[in-house]
Amino acid sequence: MFLRFADRPSDSPYIERVWRARSNGGGPFVSVAACHLELVVTRLADSAMVTVRGPETKASIIECPPDGQWAAIRFRLGVHMPSLPTGLLLDHHDVHQPVSADGTFELHGLRWPLPDLENAERYVDQLARCGVIAREQVVEAAIRGDMQPLSIRSVQRRFRRTTGLTHGLFRQIERARHATSLLRDGASILDTVHETGYFDQAHLTRSFKVLIGETPASVIRQDTQLSFLYKSGRPAPG
């Protein structure tokens, strides 16, 4: 595999995880479906840029440049940018900003230094204080399965406005990613079907072809380079 990843969780109310990646060579990889908003720094031999990356509702093939480095802050679901609707960023409609000679980039009409992942929590707190990011409590409660003093339709509307996804699609993506992690960790296909609540192997396979871009068997064999996956635990109820 030509992409190598490292990551850590965060106790910040804004950050779900921070991760780094490095490519030892170039080539195509499968970018699997994902729910979270990310702030990604890309460093190549002749350039650097910062990307606000939105959710991905389906798997796709991406060409990876050789000898690249990436550092990213993955925000918790419910964290959004009020000036940049998440729904406009879906499926690689990302916003890219060049890094200037002084090592800064523009976001929300302000100049920012590149994030230091060792101090990502402090960096993100500053983003929040300046109004660049905000939390939507309704989305956070919906993920936990909490009762809310709102109609189901109101919750669904605010969930989609904040995340760019329906609550149902969010659950499908998280389930498929969790199933992928189980298979890569050595679980059998039948055990994975049972653990993640798919009806049967055919149901799992159909979901994987859309959201993961591979069959369960090819995931087990690790035939193809996949985008960043990590052990996320059991998806939230809903």
Regions found by a protein language model. Name each.
Residues 1-152, 162-166, 184, 188-199, ...:
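Alpha-helical bundle regulatory/interaction domains
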Residues 159, 163, 179-180, 208, ...:
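Short hydrophobic clusters on alpha-helical segments that form packing/core surfaces
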